[in-house]
């Protein structure tokens, strides 16, 4: 009941041309998320590169691992790294630019913030590909290994599903 009310309110907050302050705060928050993701990745790259084969177990199914992903989600195309990095760098950039266009059309704050999360996550993974030639994944939950940028993309996508299921 409370969750439905919160979702209803979030789906109906307007993003008008006069609400540049809301957009500015969302942008500042997004840039902070991007910086956090890059700093955390840099920390774990430097911390774990001495022993990349050893994962740090925190809980039974939660570890910090050292994994370079040359492909896409879940390691698909991971073994074609000689051609995949440039290909996925171009594809990721095109997708982020398309979502940058969509964010300009956002009418509600939830929609705007969802697009912002996806843009920030995609941009962080693009930065990884440009700097390292692959995306660094370190959060290891049982069978899935990902990074904070992937989490931003996932949460942004879930928010869009919520938005479109309630609003459209």
From Swiss-Prot:
Protein EC: 3.4.23.36
Cellular compartment(s): Cell inner membrane
GO biological process, one term: proteolysis
Pfam families, sorted: Peptidase_A8
Gene that this sequence comes from: lspA
Domain of life (superkingdom): Bacteria
Residues forming the catalytic site: 137, 150
GO molecular function, one term: aspartic-type endopeptidase activity
Keyword set, alphabetical order: Aspartyl protease, Cell inner membrane, Cell membrane, Hydrolase, Membrane, Protease, Transmembrane, Transmembrane helix
HAMAP family for the chain: LspA
Family the entry assigns: Belongs to the peptidase A8 family.
Class of the enzyme per the UniProt entry, highest EC level: hydrolase
GO cellular component, one term: plasma membrane
Name this polypeptide is given: Lipoprotein signal peptidase
Bilayer topology term: Multi-pass membrane protein
Predominant subcellular localization, coarse grouping: membrane
Catalysis: reaction(s): Release of signal peptides from bacterial membrane prolipoproteins. Hydrolyzes -Xaa-Yaa-Zaa-|-(S,diacylglyceryl)Cys-, in which Xaa is hydrophobic (preferably Leu), and Yaa (Ala or Ser) and Zaa (Gly or Ala) have small, neutral side chains
Naturally occurring in which organism (per UniProt): Orientia tsutsugamushi (strain Ikeda)
TM ranges: 25-45, 54-74, 83-103, 116-136, 141-161
The protein's annotated pathway: Protein modification; lipoprotein biosynthesis (signal peptide cleavage)
Job description of the protein: This protein specifically catalyzes the removal of signal peptides from prolipoproteins.
